[in-house]
Amino acid sequence: MAGTVRTACLVVAMLLSLDFPGQAQPPPPPPDATCHQVRSFFQRLQPGLKWVPETPVPGSDLQVCLPKGPTCCSRKMEEKYQLTARLNMEQLLQSASMELKFLIIQNAAVFQEAFEIVVRHAKNYTNAMFKNNYPSLTPQAFEFVGEFFTDVSLYILGSDINVDDMVNELFDSLFPVIYTQLMNPGLPDSALDINECLRGARRDLKVFGNFPKLIMTQVSKSLQVTRIFLQALNLGIEVINTTDHLKFSKDCGRMLTRMWYCSYCQGLMMVKPCGGYCNVVMQGCMAGVVEIDKYWREYILSLEELVNGMYRIYDMENVLLGLFSTIHDSIQYVQKNAGKLTTTIGKLCAHSQQRQYRSAYYPEDLFIDKKVLKVAHVEHEETLSSRRRELIQKLKSFISFYSALPGYICSHSPVAENDTLCWNGQELVERYSQKAARNGMKNQFNLHELKMKGPEPVVSQIIDKLKHINQLLRTMSMPKGRVLDKNLDEEGFESGDCGDDEDECIGGSGDGMIKVKNQLRFLAELAYDLDVDDAPGNSQQATPKDNEISTFHNLGNVHSPLKLLTSMAISVVCFFFLVH
């Protein structure tokens, strides 16, 4: 509510700063025979009075404010009025989009940071699983897990990384360590040069079963949707920025000058433009911008459809926060088949004669330390899912933003709304009778100064980008009804699995399944017994990719909700500095 009030105040302040004619309310006085009032007003726009005649002149050199008699305007004054009118128009357009722009910028920043926090929590879960269940695999497992989740973060931010390659690299790296530390802990040092053979055997023999394929499918689907969601928000910002900084044509500038300032030349300082006339001028000036409307509407509706489908395997929270359990199940699968795998790999890699096989026993009670998964209780919890839905509802209130722009600008500039005793661009009339044109360039009212032509190149480019993102959003949107259920079952979710939107069964089949919160509470942190940054060996395992991701987005310590709130506040302050 406070943000809306601040935004409204800024809009009012901006509008009050514009140099519009007719801001006072008294009825129009008779024309000024000495040009004194014209000189006083013009001095606000241009210091000095050398361009303003002291008494009315013929004005034969004027090109916009064509006089029917003596005028108080010169050619230089007319040029200054045109420049001022175009600047006023640009400021009006920016004030119209301020609330929408702030909404998208704020949410894009918040969601990007929140998704990064989800990735860090998922990394913590996974490292905690290794520490509690397979301590002999650390710190090597920490390094591989760190590289994997770094790739996940980079992918979300738009990096050209293949998800299948990410997952394959994780399991390719883990298997040699599992083979030498869990399956054959007594393997002599002379046999440790078989890593490449083990990496190849991992895929050929499917030593982890179908778990890598399952992870590929789930991670790929959830990250693709998340990535498109962020891309769509960033494009929304680009669309608003593009239309915010449009430079209006000279034809438009002449029409604006005629509407807002030409009455001054006749000494009519208090006259307001007719409301209907304003609508005609604005529809003409913004005909190209209004062409965006169709694709903007589709953008919001497509984004809504995508958000409605972001759950289960299409929700990165659900997938990434449960990834540790699937990885654990995959390692258990290897252990259960250790004897067969050791024999086969021993022959394949030609080292079976040099080893004595000694199986490692891991009792069932060492599954997952539930203390690691404690969740801090927060009243009135807000999940990312609810925040996404809230964003969509707010965006839908702007679905007619572009088609409504001409009317918005006229309603926020001084006009005679009842079209009585108003300025029609040429003279003061008792009533304006010309009907306003319909939106769009093809149907606009025929005005001489506004030539019929297509949208500006920059508008055409942004329309093409909207078409592209709309196509991506439609492609990524979830199938509905039974098709959805069938797809989920095929990806490893069987009927009877936990399906609650807030709590999911994280863990594979068997007695080891536990129930944890699978959605982070918005702006709330999970309580961990294990801080990954303090994990043994982890502080020295920084990789080049870790450095790369820090250049994208430096989040600081994941366990500091104050930093998240501070960064959000900084984003808001920076936005308002940019506006001013």
UniProtKB/Swiss-Prot annotation:
O-glycosylated; contains heparan sulfate and/or chondroitin sulfate. Cleaved intracellularly by a furin-like convertase to generate 2 subunits, alpha and beta, which remain associated through disulfide bonds and are associated with the cell surface via the GPI-anchor. This processing is essential for its role in inhibition of hedgehog signaling. A second proteolytic event may result in cleavage of the protein on the cell surface, separating it from the GPI-anchor and leading to its shedding from the cell surface. It comes from the Eukaryota. Residues 1-24 form the signal peptide. Residues 555-580 form a propeptide. GO terms for molecular function: peptidyl-dipeptidase inhibitor activity. It is found in: Cell membrane. GO terms for biological process: anatomical structure morphogenesis; anterior/posterior axis specification; body morphogenesis; bone mineralization; branching involved in ureteric bud morphogenesis; canonical Wnt signaling pathway; cell migration; cell migration involved in gastrulation. A lipid is attached at N554 (GPI-anchor amidated asparagine). Detected in placenta (at protein level). Highly expressed in lung, liver and kidney. Keywords: Cell membrane, Disease variant, Disulfide bond, Glycoprotein, GPI-anchor, Heparan sulfate, Lipoprotein, Membrane, Phosphoprotein, Protease inhibitor, Proteoglycan, Pyrrolidone carboxylic acid, Signal. This is Glypican-3. The gene is GPC3.
